[in-house]
């Protein structure tokens, strides 16, 4: 085994047991004292510091959040389509013209896979 394999094995799984074969699992110590002992010999060049998290950017006038689902479930609440909503979307153009539901559930467009 090469040096890297030994180093990887020692770092990840801990030192090899003195007795027992390869079939035995090694217990990994997760206590803080064992972690402190392993990092004593290590030094870091330079300091690592994270900047403070920036505040969430706010544009002027964006105090109220827009609920996108409100315009879907309550079409009259959408300011841009309030005027035309009832005339265009809710009423058919001709008295006997088919609606979306008529088209969806007609024999031509109904799913054959049942």
From Swiss-Prot:
Region (Disordered): 87-114
Organism superkingdom: Eukaryota
InterPro entries per UniProt: DRM/ARP
Family statement: Belongs to the DRM1/ARP family.
Protein's name in the database: Dormancy-associated protein homolog 2
Organism name: Arabidopsis thaliana (Mouse-ear cress)
